[in-house]
Each structure stands twice: as structure tokens, then as C-alpha cells.
């Protein structure tokens, strides 16, 4: 069976409180609109007031997300001419995708160097997961080549699958795992590269109030010598006729995210029958799971966790780790669920033998999940 262990986080260079980030967004959107109108920011105060009211209505509040990490210093000031990405005195959205991709590539290469110091042993298989930038050869491939690991280490990519990509990554790891081998999964999500201050719609304001940068690595193997998760089952479904609810498209300026307000309702109406089908594959009854399992839910936003908690009748304790990660880090796309896993694995209050149900959601609309058990060292 597949086990997961050795979770390691690298925090982004910078961090801002949610209140600071929301204030920055107001100023950025105002500057973008002023550029489009050929005016100065102070000349469009009615726009600024209207935008502030919209954000007050739809943005994720500081009591839900306390802070967010970002690799760009841009979010720490409003001197637009000194920005790396958001040069809003030159255009309404900042630099183009080519420039953002170069920043992504540099940051990912640096992350791999941090995850794998010179003394690190090579994994048998390295899976790179991201939906926020694609450069070939990837940072993982470059590192493997530079270290001379190319004859032993296979490199695979799980790209553009959105917030649910950790589950397909586990499926890939499970399929390639050898009895004696190990598979490393590395998530590098740089969501802060893809804010567009020229898009003032409500769904854009919602997403811009949620997403953050995140980096995490973990190991999959047949057995391990530390506390770990043992995987029982993986399950993935597409919700019928829901493909318009979530889009992640590549534009000339960056990656454009579109989220429908119907997503929480779509998930709420689909999650119980989905969970029944996944439980049947695992050997556990749905009744046992609902009463005893902890739920590692990808916190795409507070409403996602709340709606699932309500529909399934879960206690606060069963979803507490998901809410905590959202509050501490924001939505880091595919890196978020592994952060929840790490929090559960290292929580001494979660005893050995605890069942963990994971749920994540991506474009499609896709529901991905797993059932695991927290266990003591083995093998």
C-alpha cells in the first residue's frame, strides 16, 4: 500500500495580512482603472468607493484568512514604477505572460534547490505539481540533470489541474511505485503572479481575496520509518454538466481564473453520493466514515468547507484542520490539501488509527478524494 510522509514546507519570501492585501487590491484596481481612463487615481474616487464596497461584500474577511504568502515584493508597496509584475503606470494589468513565466521559472528552480540540498539523495520518481506556470524543461528536470540523477530519477508533471491536483499526483505515484522505491511529490504554486487589477467583476474580486503562494514536498513509498498516512483508496468524478462553473485559461497577460457562485451548491448536492461511492471502494461504511473520520477538505473558500460540513453533518473538530490552513495561509491551489495533511499528521491530538477523508475540487467540475489512515512507523 502507498504511504505518505516527510512533509516539508517552504514559505514564500513575503507575507501580508489579509487586511493589508485587500487594501493593496483597492489601490491596484484604482490605478488600473485610472490608467485605462487616462486619468490619475485621485480623479476617480467614486470608482474607488464602489470597489471598496464590492470587496467589503464579497471578499474573504480577515477572520477567515489572517495572512497570505507571496513571492513578489509588489504587494508590500504601491510604487507602481518599481514593481516586478504590477507596473500599472505602463498598462492596466502589468507585465505580460512572458515576464511572469520567467519569474515563475526562477522561483521554482530556487524552490527545488531548497527542497534538495546538495547532500540530498535522489528519489526514484519526482512528480512536479503546479497550475501556475509551465516551462520546459521544468525546474525538476533541470535539477535532476544538474545533479546527475538522470539515469535513476524519472520526472513527471501534473499540470493545469487546479486545486485538486494532489489526488491525481497520488494516483500517478501509486501507479509507478516499486516495493523498494520512493516517489517525491513537489507542489509549487505561485498564484500571486496571476492577479489582474483590470478585472473588476465580483467573481474576480472573490478569487483575488483568496489565493496565495505555497510550496510543499512529501514522499510516497511502500513503507516508511516515521509517522505516516496509509492510503486505502483514491476516487475521482466529474460532476455532470458543470464544466462552465470553473475555468483556468491562459491569456496574454497571465492565467485567468473564473469561479461561478454556484460552485458551493454544486459541491453540496454532489458530495454525499460521491462519498458513498468512495467509501464502497475503501471497505468502510459511509456511516462509520461520517461518525469517525477527520475531513481534510481543500478550503477553496470558507463557503466550500461550511457547505460540506452542513450537508454531511460534520462536527467542527472534523473540519478544523482545513479551516486552520485557510486562515493561516489562504488558498494555495494544489499545495493547500498537502498542507492540511501535514497539519493532521503532526497534530498529537490526532491519534494513530484515525481515518482521514480528503476532498478537493478542480475544473470539470472535478471532485477528487482519498481515504487514508494515520499510522505509526513501519517497515
Annotate each predicted stretch with a short phrase.
Residues 148-151, 176-179, 203, 208-212, ...:
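Solvent-exposed alpha-helices and their adjacent loops that cap or buttress functional pockets
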Residues 245-247, 251-252, 258, 276-294, ...:
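Membrane-interfacial loop- and helix-cap regions that link adjacent transmembrane helices
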Residues 131-132, 150-152, 157-178, 268, ...:
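Claisen-condensing/thiolase-fold acyl-transfer catalytic domains that form or cleave C-C bonds
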Residues 135-141, 185-206, 235-251, 302-310, ...:
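Active-site-adjacent elements of ketosynthase-type condensing enzymes
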Residues 6, 129, 159, 184-189, ...:
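Short beta-strand segments
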Residues 152-153, 158, 166-172, 190-214:
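Active-site glycine-rich loop that binds ribose-phosphate moieties when present
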Amino acid at each position: 500500500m502507498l504511504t505518505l510522509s516527510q512533509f516539508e514546507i517552504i514559505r514564500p519570501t513575503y507575507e501580508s495580512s489579509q487586511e493589508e492585501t485587500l487594501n493593496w487590491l483597492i489601490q491596484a484596481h484604482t490605478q488600473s482603472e485610472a490608467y485605462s481612463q487616462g486619468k490619475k487615481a485621485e480623479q476617480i474616487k467614486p470608482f474607488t468607493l464602489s470597489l471598496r464596497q464590492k470587496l467589503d461584500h464579497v471578499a474573504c474577511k480577515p477572520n477567515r484568512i489572517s495572512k497570505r504568502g507571496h513571492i513578489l515584493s509588489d504587494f508590500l508597496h504601491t510604487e507602481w514604477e518599481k514593481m516586478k509584475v504590477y507596473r500599472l503606470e505602463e498598462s492596466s494589468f502589468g507585465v505580460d505572460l512572458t515576464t511572469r513565466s520567467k519569474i515563475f521559472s526562477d522561483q521554482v528552480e530556487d524552490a527545488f534547490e531548497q527542497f534538495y540540498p546538495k547532500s540530498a539523495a535522489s528519489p526514484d520518481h519526482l512528480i512536479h505539481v503546479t497550475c501556475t506556470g509551465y516551462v520546459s524543461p521544468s525546474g525538476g528536470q533541470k535539477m535532476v540533470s544538474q545533479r546527475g540523477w538522470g539515469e535513476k530519477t524519472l520526472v513527471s508533471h501534473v499540470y493545469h489541474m487546479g486545486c485538486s491536483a494532489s489526488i491525481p499526483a497520488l494516483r500517478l505515484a501509486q501507479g509507478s511505485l516499486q516495493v523498494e522505491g520512493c516517489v517525491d511529490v513537489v507542489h509549487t504554486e505561485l498564484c500571486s503572479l496571476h492577479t489582474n487589477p483590470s478585472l473588476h467583476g465580483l467573481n474576480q474580486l472573490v478569487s483575488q481575496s483568496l489565493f496565495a503562494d505555497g510550496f510543499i514536498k512529501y514522499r510516497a513509498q511502500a513503507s516508511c520509518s516515521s509517522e505516516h498516512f496509509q492510503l486505502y483508496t483514491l476516487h475521482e468524478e466529474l460532476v455532470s454538466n458543470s464544466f462552465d462553473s470553473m475555468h483556468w485559461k491562459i491569456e496574454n497577460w497571465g492565467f485567468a481564473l473564473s469561479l461561478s457562485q454556484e460552485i458551493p451548491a454544486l459541491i453540496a448536492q454532489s458530495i454525499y453520493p460521491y462519498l458513498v461511492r468512495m467509501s464502497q471502494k475503501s471497505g468502510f461504511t459511509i456511516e462509520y466514515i461520517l461518525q469517525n473520520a477527520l475531513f481534510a477538505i481543500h478550503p477553496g473558500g470558507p463557503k466550500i468547507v461550511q457547505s460540506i460540513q452542513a450537508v454531511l453533518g460534520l462536527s467542527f473538530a472534523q473540519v478544523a484542520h482545513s479551516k486552520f490552513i485557510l486562515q493561516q495561509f489562504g488558498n494555495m491551489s494544489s499545495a493547500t490539501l498537502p498542507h492540511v495533511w501535514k497539519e493532521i499528521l503532526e497534530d498529537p491530538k490526532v491519534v494513530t488509527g484515525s481515518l482521514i477523508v480528503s476532498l478537493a475540487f478542480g475544473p470539470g467540475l472535478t471532485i477528487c478524494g482519498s481515504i487514508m489512515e494515520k499510522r505509526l512507523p513501519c517497515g
